[in-house]
């Protein structure tokens, strides 16, 4: 017959029904037996019977597949009834959709070929049974007709084990089978790539992997295909579970944002995944379609895998930021670039916000977060790092002028908007935002009150915000899981347009504002003109006063050693004090008040210099520049200035010595040598004054013009900060030329002194 009932099991076609007392009425079974050999009537009976309305194996459109999948074990199993144990290795996965096509049923007798191919009863049973699968290729039974009304297209040994058992009873096998609807299997498989464990695929905490049962098969799909999909899904699910566990803790601010990006990305991926499951049913696409959908997130999985490997290195701070940038750069021109750039943007924005705030606080308050500026990311251009270094150096020099900051802080506030852009449109929007951006409207305080002493609480608040404590409520924007890179902004353009240019503009604007203030308060150009062209000694009256002072200390002294001895006495202090007084009086004559003249100081230092070890070691002229002007003076420039005017001072000393020696001589005796010496002395003296009044201004002219061109109101706005560095370099060249010229004069003077001694 087409349906065989044995031990409360009904075998009909490719369905197996458990006929427990609560399942079917005996009248129904009796009625069913009357239709033996009449397939169509029997099917109508099944379709119209009220007993099948609540039966678990009725046709359900939500379930995929149409056949029975069996997992058989040859061990002695116990029935799966309440109170009895059931082996977890044996499963029956059943789908209820009937086969619509009519199929010729073979007689219940076993064909001779199966009798010859049958295996002995003591052999192990094939542990996989795949019913009505046209692609079954095991045991060379591919695309064969069903050989039994009970099981379709089963391997021969399994078939023989069922039919040639002692009493033809499958009860010892099938009574212990666990029944899983096919939808349950699909749900478990769909949960794998989301990182969800299930009873079918449990999570092994020891090995941190999903446990896969190789005995599970799906009809309509080869074992190899199903196994590959399950392995692929389990690998993705394991990656997600590891990522959620690994990135649950963070050690630095940037690592927090990286963790937040990955965790929120996983949540968005799961949301998109479940949305696809709702919109596209399995019966339309199946596991193959689901696998293709998961492939669209391959770049996100690659990013997770990449950072899971590198997380063991415990990257921190800027090293992690550089690592994010390097990863995004390595992904350029690939489908992984969009998601890598989004990760870089999200994780780097807090750093750029902190950099903006640090520059803002530095300019408005004079506070400098050196740790932030000394550890700039490697992807910053070298020119940008130099500009920032010069700006910080400039700030460190002028932050002592608190009165200037408190009075003119609004002049130092400039717009700044630095962060990476995702697309070309974002760059255009950033330019618009930068034009209308005003730092005074931001949330970190009212910048009109910038006195550190009066607003200490506000200043401390700003410093606390510079730490950029992570916000746990920070929600990640909707990620773009796309492989379209046509409108995605390249990294080089990102760094140039979104990082370098805004910072360069900010620094240049700040320097312009600073020099504008200095021009109004310090009369910077008058000071520079005075400093570069005269340096005190161009004025004849001042020079005569200095020479007279030196001569007064030389009178009644026989030689230079006595002068040195006298300078080491108490009179030395009076001498230096009077010389400083002359210097200060000269500066006041040039319109420099007592407070503003502190920017440039001239001191006498007793430290010996190699050039002057034998000539007046106690008279060393030291040039110092304090404040905003210091950025225009390199260390070499200051050294050249000190040496230059030390030479000048010693030339004056030599002149005073010669004049004193002439005055001490007997005037009645005028020799030819004395006349010649006096003539040479006058020539050297004239050369010295020409050097001070003509050579120095002409030599400093290139630097003076360059400085005025940079900071004049008509200066173009696109001048980069490198112009300031160039001006300082030109300044150094000018001072070097001046130093070489005065050294020639000094050498000439020494030759002249030698000639006098010889004569």
UniProtKB/Swiss-Prot annotation:
| Listed GO biological process terms | cell division; cytoplasmic microtubule organization; gamma-tubulin complex localization to mitotic spindle pole body; meiotic cell cycle; microtubule nucleation; microtubule nucleation by interphase microtubule organizing center; mitotic cell cycle; spindle assembly
Lineage: superkingdom:
Eukaryota
The record's subcellular locations are:
Cytoplasm, Cytoskeleton, Microtubule organizing center, Spindle pole body
Self-association or partners: how does it assemble? Interacts with gamma-tubulin.
Cellular component GO terms held in the UniProt record:
cytoplasm; equatorial microtubule organizing center; gamma-tubulin complex; gamma-tubulin ring complex; microtubule; mitotic spindle pole body; spindle pole
Q: What is this protein called?
A: Spindle pole body component alp16
Q: Which organism is it from?
A: Schizosaccharomyces pombe (strain 972 / ATCC 24843)
Signal peptide residues on this chain, from the entry's feature table: none
- Molecular function, one GO term: gamma-tubulin binding
């Amino acid at each position: 017959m087409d349906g065989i009932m044995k031990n409360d099991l009904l075998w009909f076609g490719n369905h197996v029904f458990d006929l427990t007392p609560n399942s079917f009425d005996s009248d129904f079974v009796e009625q069913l037996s009357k239709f033996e050999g009449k397939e169509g009537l029997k099917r109508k009976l099944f379709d119209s019977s009220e007993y099948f309305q609540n039966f678990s194996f009725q046709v359900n459109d939500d379930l995929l597949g149409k056949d029975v999948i069996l997992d058989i074990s040859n061990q002695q199993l116990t029935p799966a009834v309440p109170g009895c144990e059931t082996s977890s290795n044996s499963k029956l996965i059943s789908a209820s959709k009937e086969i619509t096509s009519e199929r010729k049923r073979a007689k219940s007798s076993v064909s001779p070929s199966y009798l010859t191919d049958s295996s002995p009863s003591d052999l192990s049973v094939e542990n996989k049974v795949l019913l009505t699968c046209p692609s079954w290729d095991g045991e060379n039974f591919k695309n064969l007709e069903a050989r039994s009304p009970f099981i379709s297209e089963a391997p021969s040994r399994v078939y023989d084990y069922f039919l040639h058992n002692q009493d033809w009873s499958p009860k010892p096998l099938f009574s212990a089978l666990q029944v899983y609807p096919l939808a349950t299997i699909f749900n478990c498989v769909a949960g794998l790539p989301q990182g969800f464990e299930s009873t079918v695929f449990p999570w092994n905490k020891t090995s941190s992997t999903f446990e896969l049962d190789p005995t599970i098969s799906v009809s309509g799909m080869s074992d190899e295909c199903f196994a590959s999909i399950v392995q692929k899904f389990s690998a993705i699910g394991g990656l997600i579970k590891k990522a959620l566990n690994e990135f649950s803790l963070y050690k630095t601010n940037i690592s927090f944002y990286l963790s937040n990006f990955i965790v929120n990305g996983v949540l968005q991926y799961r949301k998109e995944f479940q949305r696809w499951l709702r919109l596209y049913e399995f019966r339309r696409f199946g596991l193959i379609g689901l696998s293709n959908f998961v492939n669209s997130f391959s770049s996100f999985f690659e990013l997770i895998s990449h950072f899971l490997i590198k997380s063991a290195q415990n990257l921190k701070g800027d090293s992690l930021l550089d690592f994010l940038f390097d990863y995004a750069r390595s992904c350029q021109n690939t489908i992984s670039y969009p998601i890598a750039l989004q990760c870089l943007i999200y994780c780097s924005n807090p750093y750029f916000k902190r950099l903006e705030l640090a520059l803002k606080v530095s300019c408005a308050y004079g506070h400098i977060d050196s740790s932030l500026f000394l550890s700039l990311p490697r992807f910053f251009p070298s020119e940008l790092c130099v500009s920032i270094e010069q700006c910080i150096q400039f700030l460190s020099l002028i932050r002592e002028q608190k009165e200037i900051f408190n009075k003119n802080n609004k002049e130092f506030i400039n717009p700044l908007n630095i962060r990476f852009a995702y697309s070309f449109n974002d760059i255009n929007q950033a330019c618009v935002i930068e034009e209308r951006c005003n730092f005074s409207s931001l949330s970190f305080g009212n910048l009109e009150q910038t006195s550190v002493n009066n607003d200490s609480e506000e200043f401390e608040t700003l410093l606390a915000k510079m730490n950029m404590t992570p916000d746990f409520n920070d929600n990640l924007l909707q990620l773009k899981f796309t492989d379209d890179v046509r409108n995605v902004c390249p990294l080089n353009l990102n760094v140039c347009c979104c990082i370098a240019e805004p910072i360069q503009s900010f620094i240049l604007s700040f320097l312009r504002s600073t020099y504008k203030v200095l021009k109004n308060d310090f009369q910077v150009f008058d000071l520079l003109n005075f400093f570069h062209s005269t340096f005190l000694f161009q004025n004849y009256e001042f020079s005569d006063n200095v020479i007279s002072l030196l001569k007064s200390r030389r009178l009644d002294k026989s030689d230079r050693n006595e002068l040195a001895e006298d300078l080491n006495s108490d009179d030395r202090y009076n001498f230096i004090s009077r010389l400083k007084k002359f210097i200060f009086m000269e500066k006041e004559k040039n319109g420099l008040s007592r407070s503003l003249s502190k920017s440039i100081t001239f001191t006498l230092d007793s430290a010996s210099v190699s050039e002057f070890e034998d000539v007046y070691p106690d008279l060393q002229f030291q040039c110092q520049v304090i404040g905003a002007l210091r950025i225009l003076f390199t260390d070499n420039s200051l050294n050249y200035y000190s040496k230059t005017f030390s030479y000048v001072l010693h030339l004056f000393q030599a002149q005073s010595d010669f004049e004193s020696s002439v005055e001490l001589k007997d005037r009645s005796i005028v020799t030819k040598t004395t006349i010649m010496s006096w003539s040479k002395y006058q020539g050297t003296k004239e050369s010295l004054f020409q050097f001070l009044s003509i050579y120095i201004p002409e030599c400093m002219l290139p630097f003076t013009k360059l400085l005025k061109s940079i900071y004049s109101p008509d200066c173009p706005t696109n001048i980069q900060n490198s112009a300031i560095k160039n001006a300082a370099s030109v300044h150094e060249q000018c001072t070097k030329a001046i130093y070489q010229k005065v050294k020639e004069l000094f050498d000439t003077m020494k030759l002249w002194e030698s000639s006098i001694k010889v004569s």
